[in-house]
Amino acid sequence: MSKSENLYSAARELIPGGVNSPVRAFTGVGGTPLFIEKADGAYLYDVDGKAYIDYVGSWGPMVLGHNHPAIRNAVIEAAERGLSFGAPTEMEVKMAELVTNLVPTMDMVRMVNSGTEATMSAIRLARGFTGRDKIIKFEGCYHGHADCLLVKAGSGALTLGQPNSPGVPADFAKHTLTCTYNDLTSVHAAFEQYPQEIACIIVEPVAGNMNCVPPLPEFLPGLRALCDEFGALLIIDEVMTGFRVALAGAQDYYGVVPDLTCLGKIIGGGMPVGAFGGRRDVMDALAPTGPVYQAGTLSGNPIAMAAGFACLNEVAQPGIHETLDELTTRLAEGLLEAAEDANIPLVVNHVGGMFGIFFTDAESVTCYQDVMACDVERFKRFFHLMLEEGVYLAPSAFEAGFMSVAHSEEDINNTIDAARRVFAKL
């Protein structure tokens, strides 16, 4: 047995499923998950000593590559002054100033510890601010594991075939209205049915939890218009897209102005950080200035703030996002060319530093139904053959891939060459 197999066997006796987040268990592709020893740049190294070109990037945060010296040094320096104080620090102020400068729609920001905390808190705030209970989310979109959001969710929920999680009371779920991503008609119908009851829409500007599905041109502006018409708030969940699709996020890339924004992943540089923020009048409704309660023992802790501050300063450097886009486009075009040469039907969606691989005869993939029609069994074979080639993709047909600026042209070319060999076996 390999070291990964031995560790997985031991882990399953101690941890549910052997992992601390379900998709890591390779449930969506089968086999034994890799146990990682270390990572550097664009590469992961497993406990058996094998190196992999990594397109998971810790599920998004590692936009600069693994073990970036600026982030590592910031964490070490902060740790020498103490790990957590439970009191305000200067770095929290500097971090808030940086975030609100980079994302102009955020007048104010509140730091939390995860993307789930960010979305959960933003929805509570929207409900408190509007005095309404119902929310709109989209089929196949994932916004963390809060009860009200585990309704027809994407990400690991799709991987496990459980779009509705047991343990969520029907009385909670009844306030969550699920519409079809990229379909404004379904959203308008929900507002027509509940014109005075919907507090907010929460949406991934690029759906990254049913693989990678960008918005159609009219979709996000249409959501903004419907929120304005019916007095609801628009929450854009940029946990995945923030600082990746563009410096100011997908909202800037697509030209839509939300009322609230949720952030995660890159904002922590690899440490557990989330944030939500937006209009000043809405944010003022948060405790202690307002009646909507939200708190966290480790929110804004000095280690996480130091990591995030260092990461965002690096991400804000000129040329970062142009490089991400160029590398991702090169990979997408190379995969499509290799698949065509092998007569493999393939769609590759990509935007900024995100991409999605779909085995499908369809010309495009734009919604949940398109995603579910793709050939998952072929993806499973593709995943394992690429893994044998030393390329680590997300172990699920329903998860996006992530590029970093640490990936080189050689890495991209080697990945495309590996895909050519794999397509010949499919």
From Swiss-Prot:
Compartment(s) of residence: Cytoplasm
EC number(s) on file: 5.4.3.8
InterPro entries to which the protein is assigned, alphabetical: 4pyrrol_synth_GluAld_NH2Trfase (IPR004639), Aminotrans_3 (IPR005814), Aminotrans_3_PPA_site (IPR049704), PyrdxlP-dep_Trfase (IPR015424), PyrdxlP-dep_Trfase_major (IPR015421), PyrdxlP-dep_Trfase_small (IPR015422)
Cofactor(s) required, per the database record: pyridoxal 5'-phosphate
Keyword Cytoplasm: yes
Coiled coil start-end: none
GO biological process: protoporphyrinogen IX biosynthetic process
Keywords, alphabetical: Cytoplasm, Isomerase, Porphyrin biosynthesis, Pyridoxal phosphate
Modified residues (N6-(pyridoxal phosphate)lysine): 265
Reactions catalysed: (S)-4-amino-5-oxopentanoate = 5-aminolevulinate
Subunit structure: Homodimer.
Record family assignment: Belongs to the class-III pyridoxal-phosphate-dependent aminotransferase family. HemL subfamily.
Protein's UniProt name: Glutamate-1-semialdehyde 2,1-aminomutase
Organism field: Salmonella gallinarum (strain 287/91 / NCTC 13346)
Gene name of this polypeptide: hemL
